[in-house]
């Protein structure tokens, strides 16, 4: 039986295990999908050693960047350009050796799920957070003709701090994407520290989180007329893309 899996920490919120095992069952595929909740990325190599029938892996928080050093190759169109990996294809070589190739399907899921929501006035975007997922969002927005800027609690050059989100900035940047875990179950009372009172119906708020269905970030945006969307469609689209990668 072929095996697929997910590495990350924590994985209590994971969608992938149920999605792929249901897919295997309904399509009669002799495979299983397992969650590997690891507290340190160094445990990744032990997973590979102990599971020789692994054909593919997904990668989630906080290992999308840390896993790269364990890979043999990066897909130049996605993972290498973005600098983050959420899909690993495991290719069997002669003499029992394996080749690990890293891809990024987050960019596919994000761009395809937000593209139809963008209007002519959506020219600039704020990306809340600077982790692995934020990099795919950054490149996805660029590909759609939207100018992105990162917002961080500890901003680097060219980035904004939350204290710099003035009325002028908020009026200019009408797309806001949350890539932080703030508001994810079970800590549903949390949300990014942006000036929600400055939001208008011109704003589009996109939260990469999908549990709960409506985060506090989204709810506070709706209170001021903003259009909101969660990350479930992105998750589905990136999962479809991952399956295509593993079987290409």
Spans of features found by a protein language model:
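Glycine-rich adenosine-cofactor-binding loop
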Residues: 8, 104-107, 114, 118, ...
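Residues in the short beta-alpha loop(s) of Rossmann-like NAD(P)-binding domains
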Residues: 10, 154, 211
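NAD(P)-binding Rossmann-fold cofactor-contacting core
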Residues: 143-160
């Amino acid at each position: 039986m072929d095996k697929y899996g997910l590495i990350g920490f924590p994985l209590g919120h994971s969608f992938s295990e149920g999605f792929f095992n249901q897919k295997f069952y309904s399509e009669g595929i002799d495979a299983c999908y397992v969650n590997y909740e690891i507290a340190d990325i160094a445990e990744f190599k032990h997973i590979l050693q102990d599971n020789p029938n692994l054909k593919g892996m997904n990668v989630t928080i906080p290992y999308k960047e840390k896993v790269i050093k364990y890979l043999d190759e990066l897909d130049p169109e996605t993972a290498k350009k973005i600098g983050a990996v959420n899909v690993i294809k495991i290719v069997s070589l002669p003499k029992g050796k394996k080749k690990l190739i890293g891809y990024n399907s987050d960019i596919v899921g994000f761009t395809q799920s937000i593209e139809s929501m963008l209007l002519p006035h959506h020219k600039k975007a704020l990306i809340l957070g600077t982790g692995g997922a934020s990099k795919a969002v950054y490149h996805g927005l660029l590909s759609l003709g939207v100018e992105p800027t990162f917002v961080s609690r500890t901003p680097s050059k060219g980035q904004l701090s939350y204290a710099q989100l003035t009325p002028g900035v908020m009026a200019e940047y009408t797309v806001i994407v949350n890539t932080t875990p703030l508001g994810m179950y079970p800590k549903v009372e949390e949300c990014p520290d942006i000036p929600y009172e400055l939001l208008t119906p011109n704003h589009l708020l996109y939260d990469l989180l999908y549990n709960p269905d409506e985060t506090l970030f989204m709810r506070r945006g709706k209170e001021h007329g903003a259009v909101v969307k969660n990350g479930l469609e992105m998750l589905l689209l990136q999962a479809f893309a991952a399956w295509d990668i593993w079987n290409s």
